[in-house]
Structures are given as structure tokens and as C-alpha cells.
Amino acid sequence: MQGFLNLNKPSGMTSHDCVAKVRKLLRLKRVGHGGTLDPAATGVLPIAVGKATRLLQFLPSEKAYFGTVKFGIITTTDDLEGEIVQSAPVPELMLSDIEKVLPNFLGKIEQVPPSYSAIQVEGKRLYDLARQGKTVEVPTRIVEVFNIKILDWRSGDFPEVDLAIACGTGTYIRAIARDLGRTLSIGGTLAALTRIESSGFSEENSLTFAEVENQLQENKFSLLSIEIALAHLPVIVLITEDAKRWCQGQRLPYQVKWQIETKKAEHYFRVYNYKGDFLGIGQLIKSEENLLLAPQVVISN
């Protein structure tokens, strides 16, 4: 069994918990996930099964979220799961105040990940260091936000705004909530988060654990094909002899009949044989004056 499961992660489970449960349900060891979701968050968590685990790195990086930011509160984790370190009513905050600063969070921005996160500093995960009471400097990094817009607004002593955010990999919505509060000089934290899209998978087509279990009991469960998950990658088709050589690890000289733009050098491709069998992922690389199709991940023999 190999392919992808578009899992709708429930609140209260870590991404690792979800992988462990899928292993148990499918009675398979080779299972991995395509992008960590915080325990409190819900929504799309791509799960790879079997040989598909080798292809997680090739999934598209774009993600989309619905998130709620609560103002007037600062926590240790930048969400409501952490300890509240500051709480002060801000009834004077207006929607127009948020609208003025929101463009600052669009495009390529500098972001400091939350101190409670899976990022490693000197070989240790930040959340482990934070739980030990150790303070370390979290390195700033560049992330990209493609779109951010306001969905709803609720005024009050601790007002809330609902946001729709589309972003690239590595972007922490908790950090956006924290920094939005800082920009307004009132504090802010993430109150709720749902990932509605991740790596080409969408929430409307996702399955809950209950649905997976029911389908398994009724013998109706099936994984999404590898080709569906990698549909964003262009295709190269090899003749039988070339396919055999490529699957054995040989690099193949570029061929005009592949009809691939040479400017796509260094890009990844889905590689098939003439029978339509998916062979794996290849990459066009430059070697002196030549272009070569190098195997990156070989799935089929």
C-alpha cells in the first residue's frame, strides 16, 4: 500500500500522534506527514504511506489557513495553549487600526518563530529548551505570505479578528498573531487555527479519523495516488531502454523529444515509462555543457 491520505487533523493531537494512529489503523510502519500542525490546530495534514514517504519533500509548499487573533493577551507559546504573561483590555482597538498595519505582513517578511516550536537550535528543538526553562536566541528567517485578508471582526475588551492567510512553508501563524499585537502595541495571541489547504490538499476533500475507520471497516478505504499529489511537477516519458538505465541510477543526456524547456534546469520532474508507469522523480542538472536527467527518487524497478 502506497499513496497519500488527506487527513483532517483533530484538535489535541500532535502531528506525530496522527502518524502513529495511521500506522496502527493501516498496520504499516512506513508512514510520515507533510508539514507539522500545532496540537491545538485542526485541518489538513498530508500523510504519506509506503514509498510515498520518500516523496514528501517534493510536495508543493503553499499552505492556507483560517486563524483567529485575540488582542490584549500575550502568552508564552503565542497561542492560548500557553501561560498568559500579560492581559490588559483594549476596548479602544478598532478594525481600521488592524487594516492599516496588515499590509506589513504581506510578501517576504522577517519572522522569529515562536520559542515553543519544533525548530532546532544547536541540535535541540526549541520547545524542549523552553520546557527546560532555557532561553536561547531564536534566529530570524524570511518567510513569504502570499495573501492575508480580514474575514470577521469582533470588538470588545479583548477583541478578535478572523484572518485568511495563504503562505509558503515555514510560516508560523502564531508568530503573525504575536507580531500583529506587537505592531499595534497591545499584544496579541492566536486563539484558533485551521489549515484549509496544504501542499495541494484541501480541507473539503479531507477525511477525519472516524471516516477513515468507517471506510476501513467497510473495505472502502483507499489512498490518493502519488501522481495526484505530484501533479504540479512536469512530466518526462522515457523509452524502455532509457527507463531501465535511469532506474538503475544512470544519468541520461537531455533529449529534444522530451519537449522540456531547458530553462527548467534544476527543476524536478515526474518520470514515466512508455507504459505509463510512474518511475520516480528526476532532476535536470547541468554537467559542463550538457543537461542530464538525474534520478532523485526511484520508486519503480
UniProtKB/Swiss-Prot annotation:
E.C. no: 5.4.99.25
Keyword list, A-Z: Isomerase, tRNA processing
Superkingdom assignment: Bacteria
GO terms (BP aspect): mRNA pseudouridine synthesis; tRNA pseudouridine synthesis
Gene3D superfamilies membership: Pseudouridine synthase
Signal peptide interval: none
Transmembrane segments: none
Molecular function GO terms recorded: RNA binding; tRNA pseudouridine(55) synthase activity
Listed Pfam families: TruB-C_2, TruB_N
Catalyzed chemical reaction(s): uridine(55) in tRNA = pseudouridine(55) in tRNA
Family matches, as InterPro entries: PsdUridine_synth_cat_dom_sf, PsdUridine_synth_N, tRNA_psdUridine_synth_TruB, tRNA_sdUridine_synth_fam1_C
Active site: D38
UniProt family annotation: Belongs to the pseudouridine synthase TruB family. Type 1 subfamily.
NCBIfam families: TruB (TIGR00431)
Function statement: Responsible for synthesis of pseudouridine from uracil-55 in the psi GC loop of transfer RNAs.
Protein name as annotated: tRNA pseudouridine synthase B
Native source organism of the sequence: Trichodesmium erythraeum (strain IMS101)
